UniProtKB/Swiss-Prot annotation:
HAMAP family: LolB. Keywords: Cell outer membrane, Chaperone, Lipoprotein, Membrane, Palmitate, Protein transport, Signal, Transport. This is Outer-membrane lipoprotein LolB. One of its GO terms (biological process) is lipoprotein localization to outer membrane. Its main location: membrane. The lineage of its organism: Bacteria, Pseudomonadati, Pseudomonadota, Gammaproteobacteria, Vibrionales. It is a lipid-anchor. The gene is lolB. A lipid is attached at C19 (N-palmitoyl cysteine). Monomer. It is found in: Cell outer membrane. It comes from Vibrio parahaemolyticus serotype O3:K6 (strain RIMD 2210633). It comes from the Bacteria. Belongs to the LolB family.
Length: 203
């Protein structure tokens, strides 16, 4: 698998985390309070590392995800700091810039990902999944600390699962808010590890 093929596969796998379905009902008062706090976050930045393990490929990259109401941007860089891929989403459309200087644009991110992967998928929920919100999951489970522990979803013929393996306290509005800093995305033959080393909540 070439670097370009891996990047396209990783991007599509990451975005698949936001595919629509119906979540289970959770009535914990503590969880509802935590969920409401997360839902007030609209602007944030997340920096970290990712590891991809597939049947015939392993990759390690750094990532930077910037999200606001006006713009979402995902940048993947190599260990040497070279940009491998940059995805930008605005109300006007979406653009992908690759490591080999190719630029692809579309009216929306769904169309762009379809051109890259041949799959139609929504990207709207990705910021929520990073924050630990189970927006439109098939099923999910909570930890004893009333944070999101796992997500399950059926995507085509594949069963995907996100495990939230570790949280860290982030200072926000004069309080501490537990946010994910280690996630694992798995399906039958693919594993993607995400480690978020820094959160910056700007609103």
């Amino acid at each position: 698998m070439t670097l370009r093929s891996f990047l396209i596969f990783f991007l599509s796998s990451l975005i698949l985390a936001g595919c629509s379905s119906v979540p289970e009902s959770v009535t914990s008062v503590e969880w509802q309070a935590h969920e409401q706090r997360l839902e007030t976050i609209h602007d944030f930045q997340a920096t970290g590392k990712l590891g991809y393990i597939g049947p015939d490929q392993r990759q390690s990259l750094n990532f930077f995800w910037k999200h606001s109401t006006a713009l979402s941007q995902l940048r993947l860089t190599t260990v040497l700091g070279q940009t491998a891929l940059k995805l930008t989403i605005t109300p006007q459309g979406a653009t992908v810039e690759t490591y080999d200087d190719q630029v692809l644009s579309a009216r929306n991110a769904n169309q762009l990902i379809y051109r890259l992967t041949g799959l139609m998928m929504p990207v709207d929920h990705m910021p929520d999944w990073l924050l630990g919100l189970p927006t439109d999951a098939d099923t999910f489970q909570l930890s004893p600390a009333n944070t999101l522990q796992t997500l399950d979803k059926q995507i085509g013929l594949n069963d995907w699962k996100i495990a939230y393996e570790r949280y860290g306290d982030v200072e926000w509005h004069e309080q501490t808010l537990p946010l994910p800093n280690k996630l694992k995305l798995t399906t039958s033959d693919v594993k993607i590890n995400l480690v978020i080393t820094k959160w910056n909540i700007t609103q």
